[in-house]
Amino acid sequence: NKILLNDYIKINRLEKNVKILGYKKNPYPFIKYSNVLVLTSKYEGLPNVLLEAITLKRFVISSDCPTGPKEILDNGKGGMLFKTGSYKDLSKKIILYKKQHKLVKSKIYHAYSSLKKYDLEKNLNLYYKNLTKFN
C-alpha cells in the first residue's frame, strides 16, 4: 500500500534517501543520480529499466519474477535477486548492499560486461542471419 509506505518513510525520516517514483516515461535522470535501483515487479517481460541502470553502472536489486531480471542479472551474478513479494528478503539484500562494497562492485562490473548481448545491431544481425536461413 503506497500510503503506508509513504507514512513509513516519513516516520523514519527517510525522505532524503528513499523516493517512491512510480512509472516514469524517461527514468534516466532519476537513475543517473541514484546509487541503486530496486525493481519490485511481480511480472516482467524485458525490464528495460534494469538495462538502463546497468548502462549507468548502477547496482540493481530485483525481484526474481518469472521472466527478465534473472536473465539480465545472470542468476544474481550481475546484481541481487530477492524472492518476489518477500520484503524481508528485499530488506536483507539492501542491508547486504550497504555492507558488501567489494561484492557490489564486482556485480556491477559483471552486469556492465554482460550488456553486449543486448546490443541492438548485434541482435538485428542475428535475426537477419536466422531469418535468411529459410530462403
Where are these regions (language model features)?
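Short acidic/histidine- and often glycine-rich active-site loop of Leloir-type glycosyltransferases
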Residues: 52, 65-76, 80-81
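Short hydrophobic beta-strand element within catalytic cores of glycosyltransferases
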Residues: 59-63
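Conserved acidic donor-binding segment of nucleotide-sugar-dependent glycosyltransferases
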Residues: 74-87, 96-101
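Nucleotide-activated donor-binding/catalytic signature segment of Leloir-type glycosyltransferases, i.e.
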Residues: 5-22
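A short alpha->beta transition loop at the rim of the catalytic pocket in nucleotide-sugar-dependent
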Residues: 35, 57
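C-terminal alpha-helical cap of glycosyltransferases
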Residues: 120-135
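A short, well-ordered alpha-helix in the C-terminal region of glycosyltransferases
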Residues: 89, 96, 103-117, 129
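Aromatic "clamp/platform" in nucleotide-sugar-dependent glycosyltransferases that forms part
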Residues: 23, 42
